[in-house]
Structure formats: structure tokens, C-alpha cells
């Protein structure tokens, strides 16, 4: 039998590529999952047997001590309540969270046909209570425990949140004394029906794809209900991607969702135990109120503290006040301060739209006669109080601080 030399050469090249190519999630030794921790060591209520499927449990993934933020997340894999995508939407997610300083606990909840959805919800509630009862052991904070779910796991997280309750202080079981409420929630490509209100619905991060139309519609509806109830929420609907994308590794667009989630968790101040400071003040540029811009506090001594920005929309006041919106502001610590000057003139029209002279005290930020013309004159970023300063503008914010004023010079 003859062998084509070209085919042989190509086969050798292909073999070389296969040998040299790195394996995603590969390790020097086979992966050994952690031993599941039973949520009811003496048997779950309503258990119909004695197999693993009858024993709700969590698998524990703790971050290294030097990365631990004290934040924790119960991970609920999807699977239509008939199976669980434990690796794809469980272990891989938990490892990602652990690498970012967040303790992760993959939930083995009960599924059909032996059990009902209500049993899975009971397992999710028990997981929240179990973590609070063992917070010292796992080095997590009892008021920074959330839940992330995918597909059916997303529905489970919603159902658990909507039906959560306070603990029973007189219960014999220390776990039953704990609250089952979620401090925050992350929902991936799943939807749920439920009565949204500020008591039972925690701050929530949503992500889905437009291709996964049915689930995207349900998530938009839930987000809208939360928005109407003034509950903090953030939603991302990516254009491409079918149902069940997991981390979406390798997708340059959809694969951004884990970092967006982390940014949201950080912005919610869920990665520190420090309370926010209700800070406000004034900003001056060259001795005058800053016409229009922003002030940003960037943490220097705590890499997981939330960076915060307040906007100065000085369209109807002679002073350049800044204050933070829904959240009071930064947490105590050292910060680098950035002040942005966006434009000399706030208005884009070149005449008084009300056909009257503009009162001087209402347009103190306008430096030209009348309403002025459109301009981007002198758009600056100030990182120092004065251009000749050797060091950046920094401050230390302490607990109890309420007002902090700033003045920068352009020359």
C-alpha cells in the first residue's frame, strides 16, 4: 500500500499541533472534587431514599486567605430540574469565583422525578442558613451571601429569594435559627414568576442573550418589575449566544459577563465589610465653581473597595456641588482623586430657548455672554491640585466624614 507523502506530512503537523496545544482546564493530575458537605446530616425532610440524589449538599470552594473578601455565593447549576450541569455551570463557575476572592458553594439540590421544585427551594434555603451558621468556619460574612443560578438554577435562585424568611431564634437546630434571605442574586439566562418587593428581592445582576429569546423576555420583565420597585439591578442582554453558554469562554463579547458581574458585585460594596460614607462637597477650578464634570475616588489601600464617581451637573446652581446617588459614596480609606472638567458651556443652543435673559445666578457656569455657543473648550482631567505638584491628589476618608471640598488649578 502506498502512502501519499503530502498526507503523511500533514498528519505529522496535525499530530504536533495536538501535542503542543494547551488543554483548557487541564491539570497535571486528575481533578478531584471536594467532598460534598451534607446540609442535613441526619437526612433531609421528605427524603425518599438514601442515595446521593436524596442528600442535598454543598461542595466548598474557598479562596486563598490573602484573596478572601468575605463574600460568598451559592452556585445553582441548571438542568431543567431533571439533572444538574454540575461541572459546566457549577465547578467551573465556582473556580472562577474562588480565583477572584469569593467563596463559592456548589449546591446539589433535589430534582425530578423523585422530588418537586419546592424540595429544591428548601435545599436552597437550607444552604443559605447553613453558610450563616458556619460563617466563622468558612471565614465569610453573614450579610454578604448571595446566590447565582443558570437556567433552571436561575429559577431556583428566584424562587428561593421570593420565599425566603428570617430564622427561628428559638429553634433547637442552630441552622434553623439563621435567615434564609439572599443578600444579592446573579441570574443567568433564566426567568421566574414571583411577587417583587423590597422585602424579598435582593439587588440582582442579570445576563442573557437575545438569541435565547424566551428567557431574555422573562429576565427583562423581572428586571422591569425590580426597576419599578426601586430595587438595585443591572441587566445585560448580549446579541449572540444560545441558551446555556456558561462562562462563555473564548467569546470576546459574551465572555465579558463574568467581569461585568464582578464589577457590579464590587460596586455594590459586597467585597468589603466597611460601611459607606455619606460624602458630599464642592469642587472649584481656578477659584470658580467647576462648570460641568465629575469627581472620582479610586481606592489606593484596598483593591476590592468600590471606586465611586459623582457627577457635577451644574445647570441651575451657582455652586459646584457633588453628592452620590443611591449609594452614599466611598468606604473609609485612602483614595486617589480624579476631577474631570467636561465643557465650558452646558447648553448646546446659542440662544435663550425661553426668549428671555438668563438669570446670572442660574448660569454661573457659563463664561460667555448670553447662552453661549456649543464648545468643548478646556476639557481636562485633573489628577493633581496644581500642575506643578509632584504627587497626585490623594485623600484619606474616615468614618463619619460628611463633607470634603476640592480645588484644582489649570495653570
PLM regions with names:
Residues 27-67:
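N-terminal cap/lid segment of alpha/beta-hydrolase-fold proteins
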Residues 50, 61, 227-276:
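C-terminal catalytic histidine-bearing segment of alpha/beta-hydrolase fold enzymes
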Residues 65-70, 75-117, 155, 167-168, ...:
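Short substrate-entry loop that stabilizes the transition state in hydrolases
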Residues 85-87, 92, 107-139, 249-255:
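Catalytic nucleophile-loop/oxyanion-hole region of alpha/beta-hydrolase
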Residues 205-208:
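Short beta-strand/loop motif that positions the catalytic acidic residue
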Residues 216-225:
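Short alpha-helix in the alpha/beta-hydrolase fold that links the catalytic acid
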Residues 271-411:
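Glycine/proline-rich low-complexity segments that form flexible loops, beta-turns, and polyproline
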Amino acid at each position: 500500500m502506498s502512502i501519499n507523502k503530502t498526507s503523511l506530512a500533514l498528519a505529522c503537523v496535525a499530530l504536533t499541533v495536538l501535542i503542543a496545544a494547551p488543554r483548557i482546564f487541564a491539570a497535571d493530575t486528575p481533578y478531584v472534587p471536594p467532598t460534598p458537605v451534607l446540609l442535613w446530616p441526619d437526612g433531609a425532610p421528605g427524603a425518599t431514599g438514601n442515595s446521593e440524589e436524596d442528600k442535598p449538599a454543598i461542595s466548598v470552594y474557598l479562596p486563598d486567605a490573602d484573596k478572601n473578601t468575605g463574600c460568598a455565593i451559592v452556585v445553582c447549576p441548571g438542568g431543567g430540574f431533571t439533572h444538574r450541569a454540575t461541572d459546566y455551570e457549577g465547578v467551573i463557575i465556582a473556580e472562577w469565583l474562588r480565583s477572584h476572592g469569593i467563596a463559592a458553594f456548589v449546591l446539589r439540590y433535589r430534582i425530578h422525578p423523585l422530588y418537586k421544585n419546592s424540595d429544591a427551594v428548601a435545599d436552597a434555603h437550607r444552604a443559605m442558613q447553613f453558610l450563616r451558621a458556619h460563617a466563622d468556619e468558612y471565614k465569610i460574612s453573614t450579610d454578604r451571601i448571595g446566590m447565582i443560578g443558570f437556567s433552571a438554577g436561575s429559577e431556583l435562585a428566584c424562587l428561593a429569594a421570593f420565599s425566603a424568611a428570617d430564622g427561628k431564634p428559638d429553634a433547637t437546630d442552630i441552622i434553623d435559627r439563621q435567615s434564609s434571605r439572599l443578600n444579592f442574586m446573579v441570574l443567568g439566562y433564566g426567568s421566574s414568576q414571583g411577587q417583587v418587593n423590597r422585602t424579598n428581592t435582593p439587588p440582582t445582576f442579570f445576563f442573557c442573550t437575545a438569541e435565547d429569546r424566551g428567557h431574555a423576555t422573562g429576565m427583562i420583565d423581572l428586571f422591569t418589575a425590580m426597576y419599578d420597585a426601586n430595587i438595585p439591578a443591572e441587566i445585560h442582554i448580549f446579541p449572540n449566544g444560545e441558551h446555556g453558554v456558561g462562562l462563555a469562554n473564548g467569546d470576546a463579547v459574551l465572555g465579558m459577563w463574568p467581569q461585568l458581574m464582578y464589577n457590579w458585585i464590587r460596586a455594590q460594596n459586597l467585597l468589603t465589610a466597611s460601611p459607606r460614607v455619606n460624602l458630599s462637597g464642592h469642587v472649584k477650578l481656578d477659584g470658580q465653581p467647576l462648570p460641568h464634570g465629575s469627581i472620582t475616588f479610586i481606592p489606593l489601600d484596598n483593591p476590592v473597595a468600590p471606586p465611586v464617581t459623582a457627577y457635577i451637573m451644574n445647570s441651575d446652581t451657582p455652586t459646584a456641588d457633588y453628592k452620590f446617588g443611591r449609594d452614599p459614596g466611598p468606604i473609609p480609606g485612602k483614595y486617589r482623586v480624579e476631577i474631570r472638567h467636561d465643557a465650558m458651556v452646558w447648553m448646546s443652543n446659542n440662544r435663550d430657548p425661553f426668549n428671555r435673559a438668563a438669570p446670572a445666578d442660574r448660569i454661573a457656569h457659563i463664561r460667555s455672554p448670553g447662552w453661549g455657543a456649543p464648545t468643548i473648550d478646556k476639557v481636562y482631567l485633573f489628577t493633581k491640585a496644581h500642575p506643578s505638584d509632584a504627587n497626585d491628589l490623594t485623600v484619606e476618608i474616615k468614618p463619619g466624614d460628611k463633607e470634603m471640598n476640592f480645588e484644582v488649578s489649570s495653570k
